[in-house]
Every structure is written in C-alpha cells, then in structure tokens.
Amino acid sequence: MNVYAIFADHVREAVAALAGELPEAGALDLSRIVVEPPRDAAHGDLATNAAMVLAKDLKMKPRDLAEKIAARLAQVPNVAKVDVAGPGFINLTLDAGYWPGVLAALLRAGTDFGRSDLGGGEAVNVEYVSANPTGPMHVGHCRGAVFGDALASLLAFAGFKVTREYYINDAGAQVDVLARSAYLRYREAATGETVEIPDGLYPGDYLVPVGKTLAEVHGSEYLESPESEWLPIFRTFAIGAMMEMIRDDLQALGISFDVFFSERSLTAAGIDRVGLTIEQLRRTGEVYEGRLPPPKGAPIEDWEDREQSLFRSTAHGDDVDRPLVKSDGSYTYFAGDIAYHKDKFDRGFRRMIDVWGADHGGYVKRMQAAVKAVTAGQATLDVELCQLVRLLRNGEQVRMSKRAGSFVTLREVVDEVGRDAVRFMMLFRKNDATLDFDLAKVIEQSRENPVFYVQYAHARAQSILRNAKEQHADLPESGAIYAHAPLDRLTDEGELGLVKRLAGWPRLVEQAAHAREPHRVAFYLHEVASEFHGQWNRGKDLPHLRFIIENDRELTMARLALVHGVAAVLASGLGLLGVEAVDEMK
C-alpha cells in the first residue's frame, strides 16, 4: 500500500477532471506530478507540485490552477483538508482514521510491505566487484561489493528480475604477472631458499600457500624449465586459487553471485568473440582503420602512432576514438569489454548496470557508447561509481597488511568489526562520496554509531514484544493478527508520526530503486529507529505513553501492533542491505 502513489493517482484524476472547463487539461503530461511529504509536517500529510509543473502549459498562474485542483481534491475520500500554499503548492491533510488502515496493511504484509512491481519483471544484469583474480579483496573492493549487492537486492524487491554477475579478468597481462609471482613462491617452497620478489610482481604472503601447493604437486619439475612450459600451468592454478580466496572473502561479507563470467571464455573453444564483435561494428561503420593524433596534455590510454582499428567513440560524445587492437595483435581491454557486454545482450539483457571504482570514471562514456553501438541502441548501460574508502582507527589511518603486501584486506576488516558493521557503514554514505571508515567507531554501542542504533531499534521492538508476552501469555505472536487490533486507539502525536513514517517505506523503496541509491534505505532506517527510540524514551518519562498499559488491553494491543510494524519495516530494510535484524543485542 503506497499512500503516495494512491494520492498521486487522485491528483492526476483531479487534473483530468478539469478538462471540462480547461480543454487543454486533457492533453497534459501528468508524469511530472509528484506527491511527497511536505517539508514541514505542520503543513499536512502530503504535498503535490501539480499546479507548479502544469500551469505554464495551461497558460495559468500556478496558484489559480492550484485552487481549482484543490477544490477537486477536497472531494476525495479520506481527505480532511486541502491548503494552497505560496505560489501554488498544494498540501493535503488526511483523516486521522485513514492511518490505522495503512498500519493494518503493513501488518498483513509483514516484511513484504513495500515490495513493488515497479520493474515489471524486466531483466537487469548487475555486475559488481569483478576484482582482478590476483590476490585477496581489499577494503576498496568492499564498498563496490556491498553497494552492488544492496542495489541488486533493492531492484529485486522493486520488481526487477535481477542477475548478479562477476566478471573474472583472467585474460590480461596481470594474470601472467600473478603466474610469475606464484612461480617464485613455488621455487621458495621447492628449494627451501628465501626468494626476493622483484618490483612489478605481487609480494603478498597470500601466495606462499599457493607456492607450497605447487611444490607438493610438481616437486622440482619446473625449477629449471623455461617460462613457456610452466606459465600456462601456473597461471591456471593461481587464478583458481585466487578466485577461491575471493569467493571466501565474498562469503564472509554475505555476497553471492548468479554468474561468474570468465574473460578468457570470450576467445576460447576456437571462437574469437572479441574479433567477431569488432567485425560486427566494422560492418555498421562504428569501427574503422585510422591513426590517432598525438595526445594533448595527459597521455591517451593505449595511444600508438600507427594505423589501427578504432572505435568511433567521438560520435557518441567521447573525447577521442578508442583503439581495439594492440600492435602485437592482442586486444585492448576496451575491445574485450565490448564483447563481454555484447554477450550480456545476447543473453537477453536490455538493461545493464555496472558498479566500478571511481578511478574508472573516464571509462564510462566510451563504454556506454560501445553498448549503444553494439546493440543498435536496444540496450542501455548505467554505471555507478564508488569513491574511495579511507580506513581509520580512532581517526588515524590504518597501516597496510603484511598478508596483502600493499593494502588492508577485506577479510581483516570483516573479522575485526563484523559483517553487519561493514555493510551498513559502507551504505550510510552516498556511493560517489569518499567514505571514512573508522574501525573503532563502528563497534561503539552508542547513538553515534548508526548500525548499532538501527539494530538496537529492532532488538528493542522484539524485547517489548517478549515482555508483553511474558506479562500476558494470551497475546498473539503473529504481527498479522494485530491488524485486527483497535488501531484507532493510536492517537498520540508520536505514535501517529511513527505510523506515517512507516507508511513512507513503499515510496522510499521505489525512489531508491529508480535512482539506484541504496544509501536512501540506510538513511530511512535510521530515521525510523530515531523516532521509535524517541517514542520509547517518552514512555519512560510519561507512563501513559508506554507500549504496555497494564489496565488497558485494547491500547496495549494497538501499541504492540505499532511495534510489530516498526520491527517488520526495520527487518525488511536491513534485509535489503544484507544486515541482520537482531532480536537481542550482545
């Protein structure tokens, strides 16, 4: 039950009804109409911009149009008052008797309250993490992993058919570097001698067990062999070991994927899908043979002064056309990425979302152009960029990890502060803003720690329900049964404010899904928790506001219904974020 969507329909009907006296009203674009909470709760329950966005098309003053719309809205059931404010904003106050019905709908739906058909079952591919298989995941990967996972969950809750995908970059030069690094650890294990890891290779201790396993399997077989003999073998083994490590890291963070897609598969089994994709683009005129001009200012990636295959990315708004084939005949990363997204299209995805690190921001425009070109405009690519994470402890930057060699691993952070703290805090700031993650602060049990504050609200709700059951054994346990409680007994301003806050959950879900902004869920849950804790604290000072009233069963039932509603929305929202809705704080 989306109150805002329901009344948006009423507003559109009111505008359409004006067609009798204003013929132009029948041809208006009503999609611009928004119904939202007023900025000041004292102004009512709902506000709409209808007159402000439609007046120009009707050649009317916004306030004059607002008066006409308001007169129609005043006749809508459950509307107690309609006010026109300022230049033409319309504020609606609903009957007090309307809100118990909203709470009852919430209680009947439980944690499914807010589930939407916004997506209409549209297939969406969400690709995230896609860390190179060259080592353990670090704290920088963590943000994109949590963001992508929460976004996928949010989209699924909003009615999209979501596929979660991880792209394994196992065909580039970095996996050869991995193989050479593993070989040195193999020599170390096979000979018992300490090997110095030169610059340009991976120095982390995480490759030590890989080398030991290789030594156990191959003994001294490859100690004197040329690289050409051992490189493919060591590369395959090391990639497998790294992906197993990455999967374990992801599992610790509560993340799983539907698809792991290998870059190497694009040119495997005798079929060069990268080359085929380039030829397809050549036939449509999107790829041509030409020379790039010398770079101006910052160097252009992959620039070489030679005749080469170029993608016409400038035709799609990019700064320069982009190379697809290197001078040694191998493909650029860009060429492989085009073929990969073509594969997504061939698998039926017309909507793709990629989650990248902010350092890939310059890659967005060309990749979107390529997707448009390779799918003949039938598919869209949206890219969400995640900014850097600064890892702190009591305000001081955390030193690098010995295990990783040059960074702090995701696993170290999760092991220290827990999955829930990591996930919630990674989402408690918009993804395009730099995040300071303080290991000391995220485990504080205080109001200043958002994850504790929200989880504690759910635990407090469950504690109230347990206490009520202990005092009155005949009370129902199911929240759905409380939908039949005398909810009109909820008359306190704080109670009604909390009901109205909960009523905003379906709208919040659709807004966050449409904007691809799961941080909105975290912010909203914090607001719900704040209001719930506030109402509980009022009951400490004013006994008549407590949730359990000894001599008034009906009022107790109504307030316990509200507690069930709070718990359901908190559990639903935390579930979307991948955070546990705990019943007790430890």
UniProtKB/Swiss-Prot annotation:
Q: SUPFAM superfamilies from the xrefs?
A: Anticodon-binding domain of a subclass of class I aminoacyl-tRNA synthetases (SSF47323), Arginyl-tRNA synthetase (ArgRS), N-terminal 'additional' domain (SSF55190), Nucleotidylyl transferase (SSF52374)
Motif 'HIGH' region extends across 131-141
Q: Where in the cell is it found?
A: Cytoplasm
Reactions catalysed, semicolon-separated, are:
tRNA(Arg) + L-arginine + ATP = L-arginyl-tRNA(Arg) + AMP + diphosphate
Q: Listed GO molecular functions? A: arginine-tRNA ligase activity; ATP binding
Where does it mainly reside?
cytoplasm
GO CC annotation, single: cytoplasm
Question: What's one Pfam family here?
Answer: tRNA-synt_1d
Name the Enzyme Commission number(s) assigned to this protein. Answer: 6.1.1.19
Per the UniProt entry, what are the Gene Ontology biological process annotations, in alphabetical order?
arginyl-tRNA aminoacylation
InterPro entries in alphabetical order: aa-tRNA-synth_I_CS, Arg-tRNA-ligase, Arg-tRNA-synth_N, Arg-tRNA-synth_N_sf, ArgRS_core, DALR_anticod-bd, Rossmann-like_a/b/a_fold, tRNAsynth_Ia_anticodon-bd
Q: Which cysteines are joined by disulfide bonds?
A: none
Going by the UniProt record, its keywords in alphabetical order are: Aminoacyl-tRNA synthetase, ATP-binding, Cytoplasm, Ligase, Nucleotide-binding, Protein biosynthesis
Quaternary structure note: Monomer.
Family that this chain belongs to:
Belongs to the class-I aminoacyl-tRNA synthetase family.
This protein's name: Arginine--tRNA ligase
Q: Which organism is it from?
A: Azorhizobium caulinodans (strain ATCC 43989 / DSM 5975 / JCM 20966 / LMG 6465 / NBRC 14845 / NCIMB 13405 / ORS 571)
